């Protein structure tokens, strides 16, 4: 039985907060616990901190792949960003200021608390980290925002609460300061019931992530605030600290999400039934699920990117989609469920002694209004099948049955050691240390079961900086698929042109050949693959038309209307330059 940090929202002390710096909501309800009690009792202060965790700690990114090239849209439900019809009202994250106010209240009172200095330091360090996290979530999406570092007092004069936007560079400077201040206060690690809290290693890893993001082409270093050298130094420091703490790549790759708190885990949201659970129904076939479908069905673009066992690229010109599952690296089998895969990753498969089969016995339309149309095989009874013929395996609770899809309890690993390592390697490449960058790629591939080959290069052919950069882009695509990192990568690398070049995302249609008998539930796909034909199919409702304008989001009109001092981004018709 695992003890986990309980990050459920408090019911006894809930501050009602200011929205977007200027809208006064209900006053704080202190009927159950008075403010003086909060800062005189470490347990209540910790409970107050826990609601910050509840609001800001990321969880399973279920369905997020549908909004990138990782997954295909369910029944051709292409979103407005990919259609090119999104507006500045399409993305509103400004509720984050609610969390910032909660944090600022804590920071404004913690130094006056009457419990031990050691406890005050730990609580303050965590709060500073989360303020940096919250501001990064805003600034990375919109550019500079108003920096509110003290809790504003409720008032009927809203003009006293309205603040202009700070420059992006000013915001990032403050984010980095909060991280540095947090790092000084946080312990090297938490233990026992506190495992899962933010510690020094998490803060250092996050600093590396932040600097990498703003050093990348989208923000291009912000005039020296986030240079590649600074990003390299931060990620190198994080890597060395984690190395000293015994962190590292965990093998096998397929067990990272099953073996909780393994050495690869850096930042984690802990789940356990019944205290803290999430719904995974939309991720798995309806035959073994209920109530939802269509999340994170892997795209053919993702499937094709996984390397072969010898490290070479999978190329459609020289290989057949009929045998796309032959001799791939270990990450392919740990992430991708394909027609007849022998990985019984669901309890329902094991109970019914079957594999998942995605083939059709007849197909009437390869490109219907909602996708593939025809008669699905009767072994896997899935009336709402995957449009790509693939399913996601990563971060699935393998212990629950159809009736328990609301009770999934797999920990969500937000930062893995592999990310810190690859952030370090990418920064090494950008600062001219190509040897270190290549060494990191080799480590990542070695853990994935890729063979070193005679030359010991694990199939990596890149030598020069531009080619190594492309190698990192491909490697991150497969290493971190369905972990909520892809859109951030596409934005910071300014790769929307690549998305448009796809025309559409794709899948495959697997059809049983005429005259061939159905397979048995546990037939060996390696011997029956030639009973099927495979056809590449488009999966979007329209061609991808995502605009470069979307690299940085516009400020929603409702937010602008509440504060006349806010200016719209210049890529959305305003005067504010989010790149400064």
Give residue ranges: language-model regions:
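An aromatic- and glycine-enriched ligand-binding surface/loop that stacks and positions planar moieties
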Residues: 22-77, 149, 180-181, 197-371, ...
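Active/binding-pocket-proximal capping segment
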Residues: 420-424, 431-454
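Bacterial Sec-dependent N-terminal signal peptides
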Residues: 2-5, 14-41, 175, 208, ...
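Long, intrinsically disordered, low-complexity segments
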Residues: 96, 174-176, 255-311, 317, ...
């Amino acid at each position: 039985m695992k003890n986990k940090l309980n990050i459920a929202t408090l019911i006894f002390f809930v501050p009602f907060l200011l929205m977007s710096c200027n809208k006064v909501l209900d006053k704080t309800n202190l009927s159950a616990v008075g403010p003086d009690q909060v800062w005189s009792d470490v347990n209540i202060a910790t409970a107050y901190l826990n609601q910050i965790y509840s609001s800001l700690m990321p969880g399973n990114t279920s369905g997020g792949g549908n909004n990138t090239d990782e997954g295909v849209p369910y029944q051709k439900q292409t979103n407005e960003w990919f259609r090119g019809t999104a507006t500045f009202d399409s993305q509103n994250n400004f509720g984050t200021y609610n969390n910032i106010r909660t944090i600022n209240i804590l920071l404004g009172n913690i130094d006056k608390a009457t419990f031990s200095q050691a406890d005050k330091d730990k609580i303050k360090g965590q709060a500073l980290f989360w303020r940096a996290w919250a501001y990064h979530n805003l600034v990375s999406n919109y550019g500079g925002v108003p920096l509110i570092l003290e809790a504003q007092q409720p008032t009927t004069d809203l003009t006293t609460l309205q603040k202009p936007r700070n420059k992006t560079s000013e915001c990032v400077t403050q984010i980095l300061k909060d991280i540095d201040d947090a790092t000084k206060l946080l312990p090297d690690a938490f233990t026992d019931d506190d495992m899962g809290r933010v510690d020094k290693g998490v803060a250092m890893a996050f600093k590396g992530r932040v600097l990498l993001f703003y050093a990348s082409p989208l923000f291009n270093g912000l005039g020296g605030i986030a240079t590649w050298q600074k990003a390299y130094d931060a990620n190198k420091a994080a890597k060395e600290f984690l190395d000293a703490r015994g962190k590292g790549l965990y093998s096998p790759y397929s067990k990272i999400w099953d073996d909780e708190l393994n050495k690869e885990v850096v930042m984690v949201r802990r789940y356990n039934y019944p205290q803290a659970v999430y719904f995974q129904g939309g991720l798995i076939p309806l035959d073994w699920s209920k109530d939802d479908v269509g999340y994170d069905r892997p795209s053919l673009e993702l499937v094709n990117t996984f390397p072969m066992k010898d490290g070479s690229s999978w190329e459609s010109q020289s290989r057949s989609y009929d045998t796309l599952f032959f001799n791939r690296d270990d990450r392919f089998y740990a992430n991708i469920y394909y027609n007849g895969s022998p990985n019984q990753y669901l309890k329902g498969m094991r109970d019914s002694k079957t594999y998942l089969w995605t083939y059709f016995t007849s197909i009437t339309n390869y490109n219907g209004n909602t996708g593939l149309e025809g008669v699905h095989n009767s072994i896997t009874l899935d009336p709402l099948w995957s449009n790509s013929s693939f399913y996601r395996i990563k971060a699935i609770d393998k212990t629950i049955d159809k009736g328990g899809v609301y009770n999934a309890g797999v920990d969500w690993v937000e930062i893995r050691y592999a990310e810190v390592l690859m952030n370090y390697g990418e920064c090494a490449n950008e600062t001219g240390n190509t040897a270190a960058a290549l060494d990191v790629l080799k480590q990542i591939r070695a853990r994935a079961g890729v063979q070193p080959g005679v030359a010991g290069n694990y199939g990596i052919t890149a030598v020069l900086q531009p080619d190594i950069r492309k190698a990192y882009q491909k490697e991150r695509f497969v290493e971190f698929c369905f972990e909520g990192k892809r859109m951030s990568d596409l934005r910071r690398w300014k790769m929307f042109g690549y998305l448009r070049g796809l025309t559409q995302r794709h899948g495959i249609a697997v059809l049983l050949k005429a005259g061939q008998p159905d397979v048995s539930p546990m037939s060996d796909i390696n011997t029956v693959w030639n009973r099927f034909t495979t056809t590449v199919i488009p999966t979007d409702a329209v061609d991808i038309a995502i605009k470069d304008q979307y690299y940085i989001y516009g400020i929603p009109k409702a937010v602008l209307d509440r504060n006349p001092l806010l200016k719209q981004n210049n890529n959305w018709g305003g005067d504010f330059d989010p790149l400064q």
